[in-house]
């Protein structure tokens, strides 16, 4: 069974934690990780880009001049694409980029990502993160003790003092276990769990 050292916020080792092999030492399926990241980024797209076609441009639909007898090419209306200020031909219109991934594949992707992080020694486990007050300075000190400047912190429950202390630190993000996602796991230099959040993630991904 996989094991990791457990530290306190003073950077001292206080014990060990056994990790579920089914979650943290599973087969790494990189294609699933790639697919999950691609879907997550696609679903962030607003898809609201739009231009006016000839039907949407304001103005008359009257012919600018008669069909015959002028010596010029025939024209339908001044809203046509060839006129300045006319509608755009075949321009972009709003669309949805949403993609989906079934629950089984999504869980497998999370297990693969966590296993990859474990194999690459990018996981840190703390016994708890209890901040008595909101203090960015104190939390920066905790991170510096582990030589970190880019980290994802995963908690098992809402931790208001921690969230407020971390929100103004560049390249640091605090997530509850319910919000754990592939993109953030892959983005940060290191992922910091508490013991309770490890157990909660294991419970969610083993079931």
From Swiss-Prot:
Transmembrane segments: none annotated. GO terms for biological process: translation. Keywords: Ribonucleoprotein, Ribosomal protein, RNA-binding, rRNA-binding. One of its GO terms (molecular function) is rRNA binding. SUPFAM superfamilies: Ribosomal protein L4 (SSF52166). GO terms for cellular component: ribonucleoprotein complex; ribosome. InterPro entries: Ribosomal_uL4 (IPR002136), Ribosomal_uL4-like (IPR013005), Ribosomal_uL4_dom_sf (IPR023574). Residues 59-78 are annotated as: Disordered. It holds the Pfam family Ribosomal_L4. Belongs to the universal ribosomal protein uL4 family. Part of the 50S ribosomal subunit. One of the primary rRNA binding proteins, this protein initially binds near the 5'-end of the 23S rRNA. It is important during the early stages of 50S assembly. It makes multiple contacts with different domains of the 23S rRNA in the assembled 50S subunit and ribosome. NCBIfam families: rplD_bact. This is Large ribosomal subunit protein uL4. The gene is rplD.
């Amino acid at each position: 069974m996989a094991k990791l050292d457990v530290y306190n916020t003073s950077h001292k080792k206080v014990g060990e934690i056994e990790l579920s092999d089914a979650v943290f030492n599973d087969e790494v399926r990189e294609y699933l990780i790639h697919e999950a990241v691609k879907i997550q980024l696609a679903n962030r797209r607003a898809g609201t880009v739009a231009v006016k076609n000839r039907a949407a441009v304001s103005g008359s639909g009257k012919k600018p001049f008669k069909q015959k007898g002028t010596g010029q090419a025939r024209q339908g209306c001044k809203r046509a694409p060839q006129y300045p200020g006319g509608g755009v031909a075949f321009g972009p219109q709003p669309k949805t980029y949403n993609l989906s991934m079934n629950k089984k594949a999504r869980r497998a992707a999370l297990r693969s990502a966590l296993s990859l992080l474990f194999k690459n020694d990018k996981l840190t486990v703390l016994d708890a993160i209890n901040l008595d007050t909101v203090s960015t300075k104190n939390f920066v000190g905790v991170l510096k003790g582990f030589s970190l400047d880019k980290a994802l912190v995963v908690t098992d429950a809402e931790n208001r003092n921690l969230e407020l202390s971390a929100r103004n630190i560049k390249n640091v993000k605090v997530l509850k276990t319910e919000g754990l996602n592939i993109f953030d796991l892959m983005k940060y230099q290191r992922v910091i769990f508490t013991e309770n959040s490890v157990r909660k993630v294991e419970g969610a991904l083993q079931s």
